Amino acid sequence: MNHAWVDRHFLPEFFRDHALNLRAVLILRIGLVALGVATITLLRRWAARATARLGALSILMAAAPSLLALVLAVAVSEIIVRTAAWRVAAEAPKTPEPQLQADPRLGWRFTPGRVGYWIKGGRRIAYAIDAGGRRAASPSSRPDMNCPTIVFAGESIIAGVGLQWPETIPAQVGQRLGVQSVSVAVNGFATDQAYMRLKDQLPRFHRPLAVVMLFSPALFWKNLQVDRPHFGPGLVWQPARPTLRLTEIAHRAVPYLSDAEIEAGVQMTRAVLRATLADARARGAEGVILTPVFTPEEPGAVALRRRILDQGGIPYLLVPLDQTWRIQGDGHPDPRGARVVGEAVAARLKPHIPPNSACRSGS
């Protein structure tokens, strides 16, 4: 379990310093060594003396109450965790806004037709969600389905956590290009959930100009979670797979993944991104895979990006961001970072926006 082994089996995470994985593995190694030494030097001698004096059956009978108590403690803990509020969407950092509600198809979605407020980065942010469950300028905003539209899909980076609506990437791109832009992103979504949300929403827009899908290597780990609706083999949409919550907690504390699990996630992610571009082309729209990265990138994130996108032959728009362009106490891009991303997307799409595409201001 050296540094290379950790890089291979512990994926980069947006909200988790990779150094934590190295420390966790180091602590685990020390703990295993200590346990082995204790077993050899202490427990073996005690067990030998106790067996000689009492007999194996007596020892088992004496230990039975403790073992039963341990089993019951695990069972009760599992029940407590299952009855507590538990959802993948509540990944750190936890925020009460924008408010989420259960969705039988996608797992969760924004609560439609409301506005909520939350302090983020020292600012009071208004999160307005329209009747279609899309973040917008106000709850009463209604996109014109007949207007030329740029559709953005993804998760909280696109939804604009910590940003006022005009500061979000979709709003900035729409303003710069003078066309309607709509966000169908939902906080906490993995790539496959974002794609399914896009498939639900895209047919409603009669004149899509472009489809922009976010992909971040630091969020790839979400694509391997199965305790939510997800794609199985062959891009078959499957319901959440029941799992022990205690096992999930342990995995999140030590997020080890096997080579096979990671490879399956790579193949699924490639297929979803290719399908996104194909769906855009089928509607006569320009497809863009948007990949903002904070620099310098972690080596593991670079390797993952190249493995999924470059080796997969998937074109993408890479937007480097300064590490300081993060919301205070949070990992999301701040207004400076969002502005740089918005400028890059607008520049990428400008050649594909026909003259007189403006219909009315974006939602």
Regions found by a protein language model. Name each.
Residues 2-9, 214-309, 314, 318-330, ...:
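Serine-dependent acyl-ester chemistry module
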Residues 62-88:
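Transmembrane alpha-helices and immediately adjacent membrane-cytoplasm interface residues
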Residues 159-234:
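Conserved SGNH/GDSL esterase-like catalytic core that processes O-acyl groups on lipids
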Residues 191, 195, 266, 270, ...:
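Short, amphipathic alpha-helical "lid/cap" segments that border enzyme active or binding sites
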